[in-house]
Amino acid sequence: MVDRRTFFRGAGLTAAAIFGTGLLGACSSAVDEQRAGAATGASGAPVRGGTLKTGIPADVIPATFLTNTSGATTVIGLAYDTLVRYPHDKVEPQPRLAKSWQLAADGLSLSLELRDDVTFHSGRPFTSKDAEFSLRTYADPKWTAQLRSTAAAITAFDSSDPHRLVLTLAHPLGNVFDLLDTVPILDSESIDKLAAGDAFIGTGPFKLVSRTPNSALVFERNEHYWIPDRPFLDRVEVSVIPDSQALLSSLKSGQVAVAGGLNYRDTETLGETAGFQAVSLEGAELQVYVGANVTHPALADVRVRQAIAYAIDRDRVISEVFRGSGYPVNLPWPKSSPAYDEARNTTFTRDATKARAILAGSGIAVPTLPLTYQAGNPFYEATAQIVQANLAEIGIPVELDPQEGATFIKALIGGTIPALWVTFHSWAQYVPSTLTISAYPFNALKNSSHYESPAYVDAAGAAWRVTDGTGAEAKDRYRAVSDQLLDGLFLVEIGVVLNQLAAAQRVQGIDWTKRSEIVYTDTYLA
């Protein structure tokens, strides 16, 4: 079993530092209020008003606002809108700020009809020039946005009509609607303040009214939101609580009513406890994996990476760390993906004997390898411990290397992690070409592993350049991509996992995007 000290280390001190002596005094009244609210909400009718208090493990990092990091997803979900939005269970765009569209038969242009009743939090009307600005900004390398390649394939914009935007594309883009689902509509007049972390002005259901870096964000209802009578809530207060046990204590005591970033065991327990609920973010799957820097002398040989792939106990990671909320895979695609392939997902199953034989056949004496992960995250640390034990079993010594969150993200983006790492990736729940064209770990042209392969570049490019990203032609091309991933093995997939929230039962109407941006537009306190 996973060492439970992983999940509790330092919790008491951190909780005391955050809550001080007021924690115990507030505990009983807050819990009583929570239970009373749950009973009142039995009718199921939405209730207007109230303040929702939530907890997240990390603050927004302005420089990585467009990279799908956890703090940014909180702000985007509350304060921003996109042109389209995918439903949870498929990649079929639904109207948001774009109310309709027409993709040319040759896939080389896309015309978007935009809403004319939308304003920014500043009061300025939203027009096609704002949509153009947002897409151009997303393509700017300084923001290191993961779908930048797709945004950069837009070669021309026609925003002459304030309520119509026409995009000219360099070639057919099977994932163009992934881009439109992802890019938040940004305010050109305050973009410098966004970069500094001083203002986050969007068109979303809530507007940011205050931010204390690494501590708290406060949002109030956007009274001029384009969806009538929404949002229901008056206010959302977000506390940044990096320690998972302090966050758990805060939820149990009623200091917050929604918490993201708890370990799966605690979320599972809360889901079985009166007054609480566990919310699985269906359609926003994450993948946990081991990455390898192939410029490391020992990891340059694919046979060493194959040995690692055979050594990892995927079933144990899914069952112990994620409490069965997921399933083992060899490839990144979730079961809902048009690229999912059951047969290819059994290529590497745990076989320590075979792993040792492959390692011996390589003739490489593998030195101690650092295994880097984001410190303070219980999923990563527990997974890293299992991987460390698995690799020790086949003769590969591993030293755990926890890094502070911003440092880890910078190293991942910059490709400076020295050997192995454990983290999540996303984007596989989208049109499959998005992953191999865009995501840092997978990008065929430049990735975090420094893996280079003309065959992989060709396969990824061919899968991208299709008009219909879910059609038969695309699926054939995705199989070629999957084969390249298994052959190169610069990333060793462990499993698909469902992101989860824990919440008080009285919090109803929680929604989310495919990027795990939590959406409180329809949320109310019962």
Question: Where in this protein do the model-derived segments appear?
Answer:
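N-terminal lobe/hinge region of extracytoplasmic solute-binding protein
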Residues: 55-105, 136, 201-202
